[in-house]
Amino acid sequence: MNRLPARISRVEISERRNMKTLVVTKTGSLEIREVAVPEYNECQALVKMVCCGICNGTDAKLIHHTFKGFGEDAYPLMLGHEAVGQVVETGGRVSSYKKGDYVLLPFVSEVPDDEELKSGWGGFSEYGVIDDAAAYPEGEAPECAYAQSVLPKSVDPVDATMIITLREVLSAIKRFGMSRGESVTVFGCGPV
């Protein structure tokens, strides 16, 4: 399990709680397993997952063992990264999220030490964790904290799973230096 900086402590949970999660096995099969609800620290919030999209570029490749950088030792793993959830508990330093907020990109990035699973972001789990970048000491927030945010009340959580895909498309446009009015050629007819 990841170690926290000395100034950040875990939220103490009186008893172990369990949840269900979708797992990709070493053979590429899917199964539902019962695992511990993720622990969180004082700079994070516990989130009840509401919905999660299926990403052809990530989830399908993880299922078929073709995702770059995920070798056989990465399995079994919890699947899903295009998730939206609702905050149910917050750590003591959290100020950007409150109970009841719908949030983008909650993950299960840490798996309890007694579980054999690895994380494929865990969006198809019953619970996940979101980081509050503002709660961490300067320079110590995980990178994902800057992509996680409160969902505006006017946006349906199911529709919001597409925001994550849109963000990836906008990122590609930025990386390739495309500007408004330019012509581009798109090869293939993938989902994005």
Region annotations inferred by a language model:
Residues 7-18:
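Short, Lys/Arg-enriched N-terminal segments with co-localized hydrophobic residues
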Residues 20, 31, 36, 48, ...:
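Residues located in well-ordered beta-strands
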Residues 20, 44-46, 183:
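Residues that mark the start of a beta-strand
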Residues 38-53, 66-109, 120-122:
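Glycine-rich beta-strand-centered segment in the early N-terminal region that forms part
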Residues 57-63:
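Cytochrome P450 core scaffold surrounding the K-helix E-X-X-R motif
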Residues 110-184:
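NAD(P)H dinucleotide-binding glycine-rich loop of Rossmann-like/cofactor-binding domains
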Residues 190-191:
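Glycine-rich NAD(P) Rossmann-fold beta1-alpha1 loop
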